[in-house]
UniProtKB/Swiss-Prot annotation:
The gene is rasW. Keywords: Cell membrane, GTP-binding, Hydrolase, Lipoprotein, Membrane, Methylation, Nucleotide-binding, Prenylation. Ras proteins bind GDP/GTP and possess intrinsic GTPase activity. PROSITE patterns: RAS. It is a lipid-anchor. It comes from Dictyostelium discoideum (Social amoeba). This is Ras-like protein rasW. The modification Cysteine methyl ester is found at C213. GTP binds at residues 16-23, 63-67, 122-125. GO terms for molecular function: G protein activity; GDP binding; GTP binding; GTPase activity. Pfam families: Ras (PF00071).
Length: 216
């Protein structure tokens, strides 16, 4: 039976708007299959062993609800985790707009803006229904200091890579000399004029949103 050192057990929290496929992404990673129908999640937890850069880790994964009325519970979930995966659907502009809300909540609860966060755009298999471009996702992630990938829970595209890269992000925060960024993920290098990027991403974004990027 494999035993794990404390620093080889990593707690991850999956957050995002309702209906974006958080559970589908998680179950695809855990069980290698796609769930078409499931009841709305309040809180589910999973464990899986993974190998990242020749190191074995045990991931404790918390799949959370997206409903606004569960904000108090979400604060508790945030405090219990080391890394975060924020999910939106590329077929839903409103879920993309909510990403910054979830990021702000993490920063508020942990009282730090140096938090390991991976942002992912799910449902890229539904290209005909796409409302958010890859470039928009990439630009917002860079602006807010997050890594970024697009995935398909249905086809398993990039699902394993997302979790592996999130492990690297968490470990880099613990030890900046370890786990160099992979070629598949975006660096956290800020853009020069991030306020213009936010405006380009979504002309409906309020001034309160752009102010965060200006401060970075």
């Amino acid at each position: 039976m494999t035993s794990y050192k404390n620093n080889n057990v990593i707690s991850l929290c999956i957050m995002g708007d309702g209906g974006v496929g958080k559970t589908a992404v998680t179950i695809q990673f855990i069980s290698n299959h796609f769930v078409y129908y499931y009841d709305p999640t309040i809180e589910d937890s999973y464990r899986k062993q993974c190998l990242v850069d020749d190191q074995v880790y045990m991931l404790d994964i918390l799949d959370t609800a997206g409903q606004d009325e569960l904000t108090a519970m979400r604060d508790q979930w945030i405090r219990s985790c080391e890394g975060f995966i924020l999910v939106y659907s590329v077929t839903s502009r409103s879920s993309f707009d909510q990403i910054q809300f979830f990021r702000e909540q993490i920063i508020r609860v942990l009282d730090s803006d140096d938090v390991p966060i991976m942002m992912i755009g799910n449902k890229i298999d539904l290209d005909d229904e796409r409302q958010v471009t890859f470039q928009e996702g990439k630009d917002l992630a860079r602006c807010l200091g997050m890594s970024f990938m697009e995935v398909s829970a249905k086809n398993r595209t990039n699902v394993e890579e997302v979790f592996n890269e999130t492990v690297r992000i968490v470990k880099r925060k613990e030890d900046p000399q370890s786990h160099k960024p992979s070629k598949d993920s975006d660096s956290k290098k800020p853009l020069v004029n991030t306020s213009k990027i936010i405006k380009k991403i979504n002309t409906r974004v309020k001034q309160t949103k752009t102010s965060i990027c200006k401060m970075m």
